[in-house]
Amino acid sequence: NIKDFKEHIISILTIDDFVNYNNGNLIRYFYDLEDEIDINEYKNTRTYKTLKINNEEDIIYYKKIISAFNNFIEFLKDDELFIDYTYLWDIICTPNPKLFAKGLNLIIMEISDDDITNNIGIVCPTNYHTNNIYNARKPCLFLIKKDDYYEPIYSRFEGNKISIMKTFSEYKVSSSNQEMKNILQKIIKPYFNKL
């Protein structure tokens, strides 16, 4: 469920990864100058080790990072707030052995109620919001988005035993996923490569 997924994301977040997500924009979105920050709690990070301790600008910047990191975690914990997919895109797509070892290509197909043609849009964050572009070597996770709700698209195969495929790949070729491979190569990959 959503609560468990958010708790898992919080448990794997590190300040060193956080500074890179969304091209560093999460710091700008979530820091608060009013926060009281004790950097001593965060001395065992790669980011801290790159600081010049005598440089006041470095210390101020590191306090912004810590503030943003803590506020982002509080944001994720709040079940009343809507979490825009752009905040989570890099967390989900970046390789992380505790989440998705190879990372993912996240493909969100949006259904709009105001489109009389029943078209489905492909949602893709701009380079401003992500470090992750489509990579054919990563597995692809498909989601359907309608309003603020997301549902995964899985493939189910029945044979000697039921098998559920949660991600798809251009490189795993089998008769059972040939249609998905064609969609990835002919529609999804060219769309993402245009951006």
Where are these regions (language model features)?
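Deubiquitinase catalytic domains
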Residues: 70, 74-195
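Papain-like cysteine protease catalytic cores
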Residues: 1-120
